[in-house]
């Protein structure tokens, strides 16, 4: 006799269903907006928030209506209560938030594709109805175009390899524009803008990209811009240091202090912007921690992922 119990994992169903345990938690958002309370998350009505969930990557964030219902049911049966929407802006997958289908080359990344958004809206609605919350990434794999007004866009085929999003003014403007478009988007199925829907509980500013783990300063004018910012920072503090000739990837204490401060300012600027447009949920900077310096840069954030 076999010692193993069959436990098949179907793509459209589950061999068990424990969704009845969480029936009283439907719809997601019934307890109000989530916030941080000391060392834990809490909803407006005082209910402590705890989550167990999954990532949806790239095109998986934009399923057909039929599959959105199927996958929401499947997740609910397992007791899953949160989905992180990741790589929404990934050009290498289709659909993505800027383009519903492959074909004509995108001239810019400054508009959300209405067909992609309609599918995302319905998926968010299906999850919400089953008591499943949503976590939204902001910047992940966005590939800037020349028409976006980004210098040397053609030289950065994979923008995730470079740390320029953290200090370039044009890239920061584009990030804010994207945030405004997404958070102010009205979901016709819930009747709420994303920023006004308590089914969204967390967000992060940028995925796996920072001045410490992505020390690739090989593209101009960004290398010169970074050295200019570094030199001005040194001058304000009266520190003697070779800002022009130093290795920008070196593990130097002075350079690390500057990067930490610059990263912290970037996180604060993006957080403050989201708050200014009405985002009400906890915000973090990025979702990984390669050094104590990067951890220190999160001191003003609501949580650390």
Q: Which residue ranges define each predicted feature?
A:
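N-terminal pre-domain segments of enzymes
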Residues: 1-31
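Active-site mouth of glycoside hydrolases
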Residues: 29-304
């Amino acid at each position: 006799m076999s010692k193993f119990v069959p436990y098949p994992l179907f793509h459209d169903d589950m061999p068990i269903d424990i969704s009845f345990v969480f029936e009283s938690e439907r719809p997601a958002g019934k307890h109000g907006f989530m916030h941080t309370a000391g060392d834990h998350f809490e909803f407006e009505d005082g209910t402590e928030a705890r989550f167990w969930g999954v990532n949806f990557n790239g095109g998986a964030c934009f399923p057909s209506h039929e599959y959105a219902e199927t996958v929401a049911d499947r997740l609910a049966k397992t007791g899953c209560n949160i989905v992180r929407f990741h790589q929404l802006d990934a050009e290498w997958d289709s659909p993505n938030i800027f383009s519903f289908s492959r074909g004509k080359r995108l001239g810019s990344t400054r508009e959300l594709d209405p067909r992609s958004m309609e599918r995302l809206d319905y998926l968010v609605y299906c999850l919400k109805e089953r008591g499943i919350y949503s976590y939204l990434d902001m910047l992940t794999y966005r590939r800037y175009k020349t028409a976006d007004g980004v210098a040397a866009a053609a030289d950065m085929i994979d923008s995730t390899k470079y740390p320029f999003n953290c200090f370039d003014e044009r890239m920061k403007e584009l990030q804010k524009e994207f945030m405004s478009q997404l958070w102010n988007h009205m979901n016709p199925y819930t009747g709420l803008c994303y920023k006004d829907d308590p089914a969204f509980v967390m967000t992060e500013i940028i995925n796996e990209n920072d001045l410490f783990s992505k020390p690739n300063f090989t593209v101009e004018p960004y290398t010169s811009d970074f050295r200019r910012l570094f030199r001005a920072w040194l001058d304000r503090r009266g520190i003697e240091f070779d800002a022009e000739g130093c290795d920008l990837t070196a593990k130097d204490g002075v350079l690390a202090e500057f990067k930490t401060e610059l990263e912290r300012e970037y996180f604060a600027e993006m957080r403050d912007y989201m708050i200014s447009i009405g985002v009400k949920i906890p915000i973090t900077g990025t979702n990984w921690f390669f050094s104590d310096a990067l951890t220190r840069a999160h001191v003003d954030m609501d949580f650390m992922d």
